[in-house]
Amino acid sequence: MTMTAAPAARKSTYAPLELFDTDRLLDADERDIAATVRKFVDTRLKPNVEEWFESATLPRELAKEFGALGVLGMHLDGYGCAGTNAVSYGLACMELEAGDSGFRSFVSVQGSLSMFSIHRFGSEEQKSEWLPRLATGDAIGCFGLTEPDFGSNPAGMRTRARRDGSDWVLNRTKMWITNGNLADVATVWAQTDDGIRGFLVPTDTPGFTANEIHRKLSLRASVTSELVLDNVRLPASAQLPHAVGLSAPLSCLNEARFGIVFGALGAGRDSLETTIAYAQSREVFDKPLSGFQLTQEKLANMTVELGKGMLLAVHLGRIKDAEGVRPEQVSLGKLNNVREALAIARECRTLLGGSGITLEYSPLRHANNLESVLTYEGTSEMHLLSIGKALTGQAAFR
């Protein structure tokens, strides 16, 4: 595998990541995957994202389009999945989130939470039943871990699965579940007499209800739901046989967080590229906004942080592909890249002036979305504590 791209001819202007020549760090297949997903985002998603964000909708038919694109479970092997490396998956996440965090969230939950939980912990029958349909988008999955009172502390979950003969009966509520109202199957985590276990719950099971959460200011082009389990009866075959304890759902979250390490950079990159184009065309005091020192200082500082985040993301991806990335390393990536992407989106909004509060320009939409990304799949505070534990050997979570 060659990692060297041909030397680029000198240009008069560069896109932010071109200054870092990050394409040189990628092989031809990785560059092709990124270009393919970017084309889909530019032609299919970006022309519609303002309408979807404003109306708080995400068309269900996008699932099959994502499936045809090959991004659903693309980093998994077999069962109709592409089996790409981690860097390719990350690059796809980056391009999707350049469109909107809602698109990357859909793909991330489908592939790294729903499909990954089945792929890693499911029986052969469960894998064969669900993974091919989830890979094509003919079926949609969701992942039920968070509860109304238990987000950063999932060990305290109150969802309970009790034995009744050979069946399981599940009760309680899950909250903030992406794709919940769209899903055909939910991976639900519950307390049992033997500890936390995972279950595959078809969403047409009696007693299962998904209630969409409305009036959101963030992730509006995404479906977020409450899942209610009221005496949901499942056969023994619904249990994920290889999921034992809290480490099982946490390993799924670590997989999804890796996609965020790249994905957040897409939101930051799109914000910055949008703002540079605006600054070059906007006349202020008889010259382009881009010609002022303060403007160039802001653009340069944002470019430095974006490029550093990209280098970190690719480095973590190479580690993941080589020997596996540790959870605290993923915490480093999510903490840094989401934090910096949010700062970039906010700063870009200021450079856009009054125009920046409209949906015509993407930075404020990205900033609103990144407020959610900052919180879900581990708050920044929890990632700081994860890093702190790695540095000191002491857990300060309580």
Name each model-derived stretch.
Residues 105-125, 151:
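N-terminal glycine-rich flavin-associated loop
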Residues 156, 204-233:
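Flexible, small-/acidic-enriched active-site or ligand-binding loops
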Residues 1-99, 109, 121-126, 133, ...:
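Alpha-helical interface subdomain recognition
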Residues 152-153, 168:
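Hydrophobic, small-residue-rich alpha-helical packing segments that form membrane-like cores
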Residues 137-145:
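A short, Trp-centered hydrophobic/proline-enriched beta-strand micro-motif
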Residues 149-152, 176-179, 191, 216-223:
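Short Gly/Pro-enriched turn/cap motifs at secondary-structure boundaries
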Residues 225-251:
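A short, charged helix-loop
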Residues 171-211:
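A short core secondary-structure module
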